[in-house]
C-alpha cells in the first residue's frame, strides 16, 4: 500500500508559498506555481498600489480585453524616474507583433474612453388644468369675429332656442317589459294605423237610436265596469267595439243593450285574465237577454269587425302622454276623468284617439293651473302643437262644466270619490271656457 506524502500545514497569517513541491507516484518532486483566480484569464496582478480592485463581473470580449490591456500598460509607466516595471507573469509574445493588422486594431482599441456623465434632466409633472382655470384664462374670454358671425347664424336658424326634450324613458331602461328600445317606433305605428280603426259618424244610418241613447248605454256600461272591477283597457276597447259595429250595421232599439253587454264580453276576454261569466252578464241586464242571445250577438259583432280587435284605443295614448307630462296622481286622475267624460259623448268621434288623449292632458293641465300648459316634451311625444288640439280641448272643457248638471253621473260619481282624488270637484279651465262659449258642434267627417 502506497504511503501518502506529508504536506506541511500553512501557518495562519504566513505569506503564501509561491510553489509547492508535490511528489508523484514515482516519488519525483515536481514544482509548479500556485494557482490564483481560476476565472482570471488575464495576467493582471490582484493588488495594485495596495488597493484591491473590484472583481470583473461582465464577460470578457475582445474590445473589453483590449481596454484592460491598455489600462494595465498605463499603470506600468515609470513614476519619478523609476524604470522598473512590475512583472505581470510569464512573458508571452503579443498577437500584435505577429500580425501588423491586429496591431493597428489594438492601437485603436487602446484608446481610453472617458465616460461622460450625462446631465440630469429634471422632468416636472404638469399640473392638471381644471375647467375653472380654463374658463378664467384671458385667452378664452376673447371674442373673435368668426364666433360672432356663427352665433348670429345660429340665432337666425333657431338653433340657440332648441327645445329641451326630457327623456321620459330614462327610469325604465333596466325594465325589459317597458321595451324602451322600441317604444318610439311602436307609437309611431299606432298613430299611422289609428285612422283604420277609428269609428265613423254613424247616426245617419241608425233609424231607432240617437246620441242620447248612446250616452245612456255607455253610462250604464261604466257602472257595470266598476261593478266587475275590470281594467280601463277593457272599458275603452268596449266603447270602440260598439262604435265600430254601429257604424257598419243598423241596430234596433231593443237590441242596443245587448250589443253593449256582448261588446263588454268580447273586450273582457281580450284584456282580462278572469273575464266575467256569461251568466253574470245576464244577471246585470236583469234577465233581459238570455245566455244564447249574448253568444249569438258576440259572434255577429266579431263577424262584422272581421275579428279585428288589436286596435290603438284612446287608453294606449293616454298612458304614454301622461308619462310625458310628468304627472302626479292628481294630474293622472284628472286626465282619465276628462277622457272618460269625452268618451260618453258622440261628438268626440270626430277626433282621432291620439288627439283626444293629447287634449285630455292639455285640458287637465289648464284645469290644475300647470305652467306651461303645453311643454316641448309633450309636443314631441304627442306630435301635436297647442293650436292643433285647441278645438278638442275646448269641447272637453265645455263637457267638464256641464257634467254636474247632467243626469248621467257615473263618471262624475266615480271621480268625486277620495280614492280618485276628487278631481271631478275641481273647477274647469277658465281659459278654455271663455273660448268654449262660442264653441260650435263639430262637422261630421
Swiss-Prot record:
Keywords: Cell cycle, Cell division, Cyclin, Mitosis. One of its GO terms (molecular function) is cyclin-dependent protein serine/threonine kinase regulator activity. Induction: Transiently down-regulated by salt stress in roots. SUPFAM superfamilies: Cyclin-like (SSF47954). InterPro entries: Cyclin, Cyclin-like_dom, Cyclin-like_sf, Cyclin_A/B-like, Cyclin_C-dom, Cyclin_N, Cyclins_cyclin-box. This is Cyclin-B1-2. Interacts with FZR2/CCS52A1, FZR1/CCS52A2 and FZR3/CCS52B. Transmembrane segments: none annotated. Expressed in roots, stems and flowers. One of its GO terms (biological process) is cell division. Belongs to the cyclin family. Cyclin AB subfamily. GO terms for cellular component: cytoplasm. May induce mitotic cell division. It comes from the Eukaryota.
Amino acid at each position: 500500500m502506497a504511503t501518502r506524502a506529508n504536506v506541511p500545514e500553512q501557518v495562519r497569517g504566513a505569506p503564501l508559498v509561491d510553489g509547492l513541491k508535490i511528489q508523484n507516484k514515482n516519488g519525483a518532486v515536481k514544482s509548479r506555481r500556485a494557482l490564483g483566480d481560476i476565472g482570471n484569464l488575464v495576467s493582471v496582478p490582484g493588488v495594485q498600489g495596495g488597493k484591491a480592485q473590484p472583481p470583473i463581473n461582465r464577460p470578457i470580449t475582445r474590445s473589453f480585453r483590449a481596454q484592460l490591456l491598455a489600462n494595465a500598460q498605463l499603470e506600468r509607466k515609470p513614476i519619478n524616474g523609476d524604470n522598473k516595471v512590475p512583472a505581470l507573469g510569464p512573458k508571452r509574445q503579443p498577437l500584435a507583433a505577429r500580425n501588423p493588422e491586429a496591431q493597428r486594431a489594438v492601437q485603436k482599441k487602446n484608446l481610453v474612453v472617458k465616460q461622460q456623465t450625462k446631465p440630469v434632466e429634471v422632468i416636472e409633472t404638469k399640473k392638471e388644468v381644471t375647467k375653472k382655470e380654463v374658463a378664467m384664462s384671458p385667452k378664452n374670454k376673447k371674442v373673435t369675429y368668426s364666433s360672432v358671425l356663427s352665433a348670429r347664424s345660429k340665432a337666425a336658424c333657431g338653433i340657440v332656442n332648441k327645445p329641451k326634450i326630457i327623456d321620459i324613458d330614462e327610469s325604465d331602461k333596466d325594465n325589459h317589459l317597458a321595451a324602451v328600445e322600441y317604444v318610439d317606433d311602436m307609437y309611431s305605428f299606432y298613430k299611422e294605423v289609428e285612422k283604420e280603426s277609428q269609428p265613423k259618424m254613424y247616426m245617419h244610418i241608425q233609424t231607432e237610436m240617437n246620441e242620447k241613447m248612446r250616452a245612456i248605454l255607455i253610462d250604464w256600461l261604466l257602472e257595470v265596469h266598476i261593478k266587475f272591477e275590470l281594467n280601463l283597457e277593457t272599458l275603452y276597447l268596449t266603447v270602440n267595439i260598439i262604435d265600430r259595429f254601429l257604424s257598419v250595421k243598423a241596430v234596433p232599439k231593443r237590441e242596443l243593450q245587448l250589443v253593449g253587454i256582448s261588446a263588454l264580453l268580447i273586450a273582457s276576454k281580450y284584456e282580462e285574465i278572469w273575464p266575467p261569466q256569461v251568466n253574470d252578464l245576464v244577471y246585470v241586464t236583469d234577465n233581459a237577454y238570455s245566455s244564447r242571445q249574448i253568444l249569438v250577438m258576440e259572434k255577429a259583432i266579431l263577424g262584422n269587425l272581421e275579428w279585428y280587435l288589436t286596435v290603438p284605443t284612446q287608453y294606449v295614448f293616454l298612458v304614454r302622454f301622461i308619462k310625458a307630462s310628468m304627472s302626479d296622481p292628481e294630474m293622472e286622475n284628472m286626465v282619465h276623468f276628462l277622457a272618460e267624460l269625452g268618451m260618453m259623448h258622440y261628438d268626440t268621434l270626430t277626433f282621432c284617439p291620439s288627439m283626444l288623449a293629447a287634449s285630455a292632458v292639455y285640458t287637465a293641465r289648464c284645469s290644475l293651473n300647470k305652467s306651461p300648459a303645453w311643454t316641448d316634451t309633450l309636443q314631441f311625444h304627442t306630435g301635436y302643437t297647442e293650436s292643433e288640439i285647441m278645438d278638442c280641448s275646448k269641447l272637453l272643457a265645455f263637457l267638464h262644466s256641464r257634467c254636474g248638471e247632467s243626469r248621467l253621473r257615473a263618471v262624475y260619481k266615480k271621480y268625486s270619490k277620495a280614492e280618485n282624488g276628487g278631481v271631478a270637484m275641481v273647477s274647469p279651465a277658465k281659459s278654455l271656457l271663455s273660448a268654449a262659449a262660442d264653441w260650435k258642434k263639430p262637422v261630421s267627417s
